[in-house]
From Swiss-Prot:
Transmembrane regions listed in the UniProt entry: 250-266
Subcellular location, record wording: Mitochondrion membrane
Annotated organelle transit peptide span: 1-24
One Gene Ontology CC term in the entry: mitochondrial membrane
Keywords associated with the record: Membrane, Mitochondrion, Transit peptide, Transmembrane, Transmembrane helix
Membrane-protein topology: Single-pass membrane protein
Similarity remark: Belongs to the GEP7 family.
Annotated function: Involved in respiratory growth and required for cell survival in the absence of prohibitins or GEM1.
Protein name (record): Genetic interactor of prohibitin 7, mitochondrial
Amino acid sequence: MVLSNVKIFRLKSHRAFRIGPMIKAVAGNLLVKRFYQPKLERIPPASLLLKQKIRLAQNGSTTSTENPISFSQTMSEIFSVLQPSAPDLDEDETSGLKRDHLLTERLNNGELGVIMNKFFNPSSTHNNQLIDTNILLQNFPKLSGNDLDLLDFAINEKMRGNWNDLKQDFIQLWYYKSFGFLGPRTQFVLTNSSPSLRSQFLKLPFIEYNWFLLQNNKNANILPADVQNVVKVFHLDDKRFSWKSIDPFSKAIISFVVFVSIYVWLDESAKQKTKELPAQKSTVISEIKKMGSLFILAVKSATHS
């Protein structure tokens, strides 16, 4: 009995010894999967992502009946019944995704390079050369709407990457598409441009704005000696920044204020003296009257005695 118990204990200890490392390995794998996420070296292409978005949008529209009806869905259905001519947002989103997918395929197939070679004919010997200005002016209005859509899509896609990888002809075409004749190309004349803006402030039909009035084609030859006659240059000296001295204009104002103050003080003092003199005269007269009345009384008393 004792031997059988010893054998059972040995078997259990041996199994525990073998199971322990297995548990540790499994726990280690779980921790690695939990805290470590492998970095994908290859990014899924944009066309595949667009296809996935289109498929999810279509599947969402087909499986929406199986899901519980939400309040927003019921309200959208009610408004769609009340306004049958209103645009469908899901349909617009799906059409936009299809359009992006089509433009992505056109861009990946190299259609933009075909358009640039056809209309602008960049140099085949040097891939980083600018397009001739005359060719750009003549052939850019010939681009169709589909070509311009592809160009806009290419600009939006390539501007997200490294701009140092862009070619000079594409940058030139990008700048021309965005700004046209603005900036340094003010001397160019666009043949198919809109007419000049009419005056909306005065509302006179015969007055038109001309944005090139300020440009003078004549070269102005001004010598350095004539610059002083055209522009008066003021040189600031250190006396202007000295707080101990006062400029002549400030001195004149301060002197005028002091003069006016002294004049007002003298005038007020003279008026005060003229008011005091009548009071003194009245007191003297009253004293004289008193002395005269006393003298008369003294004379009367002497005559009666």
